Amino acid sequence: MRGETPTLQDYVLDLQPEATDLHCYEQLPDSSDEEDVIDSPAGQAEPDTSNYNIVTFCCQCKSTLRLCVQSTQVDIRILQELLMGSFGIVCPNCSTRL
């Protein structure tokens, strides 16, 4: 815009629409062998597991029980919630009397 007052010609643009190609020409490599490896259980990433020492009591005689388990952190928290609830572990002596 030049001048003190705007004119309509200052706002009207003389543009023509352009056609845009929206097709994707990307080609993926043929990896049918790799997909089989990834989809198989052996190809999946193993969750991080650790060894845990658990000390709890027999739900029958209240004797001390020591367990060593290998688990993920998420699963060990689930076990902790079970042990704090109604879930109980029985010692070998009490298991023969059941």
Swiss-Prot record:
BP term (GO), one: DNA-templated transcription
Keyword DNA-binding set for record: yes
Outcome of mutating residue 67 to R: Complete loss of binding to HDAC1 and HDAC2. Complete loss of episomes. Impaired production of late transcripts
E7 terminal domain, as annotated region: 1-40
Processing and modification events after translation: Highly phosphorylated.
Main localization, broad class: host cell
Motif window: LXCXE motif: 22-26
Impact reported for residue 71 to C: No effect on the binding to HDAC1 and HDAC2
Entry-linked InterPro entries: Papilloma_E7
Subcellular location(s) per record: Host cytoplasm; Host nucleus
A GO molecular-function annotation: DNA-binding transcription factor activity
GO cellular component terms listed in the entry, alphabetical order: host cell cytoplasm; host cell nucleus
Stated consequence of mutating residue 94 to A: No effect on the binding to HDAC1 and HDAC2. Reduced copy number of episomes. Impaired production of late transcripts
Highest taxon listed in the record's lineage: Viruses
Positions annotated as zinc finger (unnamed): 58-94
This protein's record includes keyword Zinc: yes
Assembly information from the UniProt record: Homodimer. Homooligomer. Interacts with host RB1; this interaction induces dissociation of RB1-E2F1 complex thereby disrupting RB1 activity. Interacts with host EP300; this interaction represses EP300 transcriptional activity. Interacts with protein E2; this interaction inhibits E7 oncogenic activity. Interacts with host TMEM173/STING; this interaction impairs the ability of TMEM173/STING to sense cytosolic DNA and promote the production of type I interferon (IFN-alpha and IFN-beta).
Family listed: Belongs to the papillomaviridae E7 protein family.
HAMAP family, per database record: PPV_E7 (MF_04004)
Domain notes: The E7 terminal domain is an intrinsically disordered domain, whose flexibility and conformational transitions confer target adaptability to the oncoprotein. It allows adaptation to a variety of protein targets and exposes the PEST degradation sequence that regulates its turnover in the cell.
Record-given protein name: Protein E7
UniProt lineage: Viruses, Monodnaviria, Shotokuvirae, Cossaviricota, Papovaviricetes
